[in-house]
Amino acid sequence: MKSFGLIALAICGVICVAAEPQHTYDGRNGPHVFGSPGNQVYIRGQNEGTYSVPGVGGQFQNAPQRGEHVYTDEAGNTFVNRKNAGGPASHTISGPNFSAKNLGPNGAKSVGIPQRARRSPQFHVERPGRTVDVGNGGFYIQRGRRSPQLHVARPDRTVTIGNGGVYIQRSRRSPQFHVERPDRTVDFGNGGFSAQRFRRGINDARVQGENFVARDDQAGIWDNNVSVWKRPDGRTVTIDRNGHTIVSGRGRPAQHY
């Protein structure tokens, strides 16, 4: 019975060892630097062969036989770190976007970046009245010829200035002068002046009764003893039956006449 238990325990141990998953690099076991062209690339993981890192796109490959650790990102760029047994480590970056090599302290460093298209040595600026061209031979300015004619126009005259001098042309004014007001018009011309007054309508602003009258901003009222008139300037004029006048209002003391 005891031997059966030992056998069962051994079988379970073998199964557990076989079922233990392969460790993957999670960033806690060493540097994980990719960088930009010219910066050090150093990758280290636990697994041998190809593996992936959770949360990081691309693929890793650890090749201890070659002493290389390779990372290829999602864009196809490859970062290689070489241990170089017996010497300093080196790294290489290559891909569609850039390339760089660092062969160690004793080696030269080269960086290759896609070359930018060569710019034209010609620089051209254009304005309405001139053009400027700058190149290897210096700069060239070309000014367009301005018109010698200057023209100014007003409602009753025009002024033209050119090579021949100044020319002013005044249009003839009408001999008729016209003034119009709500209740009248006045026309003045060669034949004299004519004034025309219009009859006020029954809907005029004036209101009048037996003992009062009001129009716009003034009004008056009266009886047998006194009459009171409110003037447009805000003053009040009072006249009694004996002809005495009192003017008051607008913050001034009453004035007796």
From Swiss-Prot:
Positions carrying Pyrrolidone carboxylic acid are 22, 122, 149, 176
Q: Which species is this record about?
A: Drosophila melanogaster (Fruit fly)
Q: Where is the secretion signal located?
A: 1-19
Description of post-translational modifications: Proteolytically cleaved.
- Per the record, the gene is BaraA2
- Alphabetically, which GO biological process terms does the record hold? antifungal innate immune response; defense response; humoral immune response; killing of cells of another organism; response to bacterium
What positions belong to the pro-peptide in this record? 20-21, 118-121, 145-148, 172-175, 199-204
Entry's induction text = By bacterial infection (at protein level). Detected within 24 hours of infection. Up-regulated in the fat body following infection with M.luteus, with expression levels increasing from 2 to 48 hours post infection. In adults, also up-regulated in the head including the border of the eyes and the ocelli, and in the brain tissue including the region posterior to the central brain furrow. Up-regulated in the wing veins, along the borders of the thoracic pleura, and in the spermatheca of females. In larvae, induced in the brain tissue at the posterior of the ventral nervous system.
Alphabetically sorted, this entry's keywords are: Antimicrobial, Cleavage on pair of basic residues, Fungicide, Glycoprotein, Immunity, Innate immunity, Pyrrolidone carboxylic acid, Secreted, Signal
- The name on file for this protein is Baramicin A2
One GO cellular component term, please give it: extracellular space
Give a yes or no for keyword Cell wall biogenesis/degradation in this entry: no
